Amino acid sequence: MKPENKIPVLTRLSDEMTAVVNFQQPGLPPWPADGDIETQRQYYLLERRFWNADAPSMTTRTCAVPTPYGDVTTRLYSPQPTSQAILYYLHGGGFILGNLDTHDRIMRLLARYTGCTVIGIDYSLSPQARYPQAIEETVAVCSYFSQHADEYSLNVEKIGFAGDSAGAMLALASALWLRDKHIRCGNVIAILLWYGLYGLQDSVSRRLFGGAWDGLTREDLDMYEKAYLRNEDDRESPWYCLFNNDLTRDVPPCFIASAEFDPLIDDSRLLHQTLQAHQQPCEYKMYPGTLHAFLHYSRMMTIADDALQDGARFFMARMKTPR
């Protein structure tokens, strides 16, 4: 699609989102478009420092968890001494960027709003690690904490998964992997998904939206996919194209959030409509005037904080509902 035919989203954003787009951090250099992947990872970490400031204070603990691929770093956020549930968080970043620090504020806010222990998983990034390594690392982390619950004062009977963008795909894929492989790590009471991609190769929203402002042009999306997958056959895997999985049964309750001007919004719409058609518990909410990745900007956007609180409320409601 010619760029001229796309929706001019920058003229339609909310005032809050526009303020974020126009905000310039003092002393921040330009994005290293021609830099190698490690340079881009370091820039992303630097750029996110401002957005992670002034986060709630709470007890945190870092733990290296053994997996078949080696140790994976996790960070436990404990807002209170005892927890009624665990929420595992998978960060976004197109499978190639991000870590526990780039999403620290998001995890702290989720821990505060749910009152539960949030465990961030620093899964191995692509292209150094290819599908399905990040999923298998996540499953290994869940298995580890289910076996060492007393050591960490965890309640592993009720667990959930959460993630943004690529992390949302990993969150849902990991829950389906546990179901499909009959791996018991606790009762998955909910999955919180913010503006994820779930397997569509093309869509109306991918044609109408996406540009330099969000890093989600068609070329960008192709690059992320090629970095993550081993080969073209993986495109149809039921833990990458989640619409090729069985979404008609035993899908944990899903909170599905989308951004109005996100090229990935049709992934969320299709996921919601599929689950709803098959009586799988789910809730869908679109946040008007927003771009992909708006969850990061709660320092300037009340709607970002609203989206986190909406997900937290969904999770807490499922904590009280026998399943």
From Swiss-Prot:
EC number(s) reported in the record: 3.1.1.-
GO molecular function terms listed in the Swiss-Prot or TrEMBL record: carboxylic ester hydrolase activity
Source superkingdom: Bacteria
Disulfide partners: none
Span(s) of short sequence motif Involved in the stabilization of the negatively charged intermediate by the formation of the oxyanion hole: 91-93
Keyword Nucleotide-binding found: no
Cellular localization per UniProt: Cytoplasm
Record carries keyword 4Fe-4S: no
Keywords from the named record: Cytoplasm, Hydrolase, Serine esterase
GO cellular component terms attached to this protein's record: cytoplasm
PANTHER family per the UniProt record, alphabetical: AB HYDROLASE SUPERFAMILY PROTEIN C4A8.06C (PTHR48081), ALPHA_BETA HYDROLASE FOLD-3 DOMAIN-CONTAINING PROTEIN-RELATED (PTHR48081:SF8)
Oligomer and partners: Homodimer. Interacts with MalT and MelA.
Free-text function comment from the UniProt entry: Displays esterase activity towards short chain fatty esters (acyl chain length of up to 8 carbons). Able to hydrolyze triacetylglycerol (triacetin) and tributyrylglycerol (tributyrin), but not trioleylglycerol (triolein) or cholesterol oleate. Negatively regulates MalT activity by antagonizing maltotriose binding. Inhibits MelA galactosidase activity.
HAMAP family from the UniProt entry: Acetyl_esterase
UniProt protein name: Acetyl esterase
Lineage of producing organism: Bacteria, Pseudomonadati, Pseudomonadota, Gammaproteobacteria, Enterobacterales
Gene behind the chain: aes
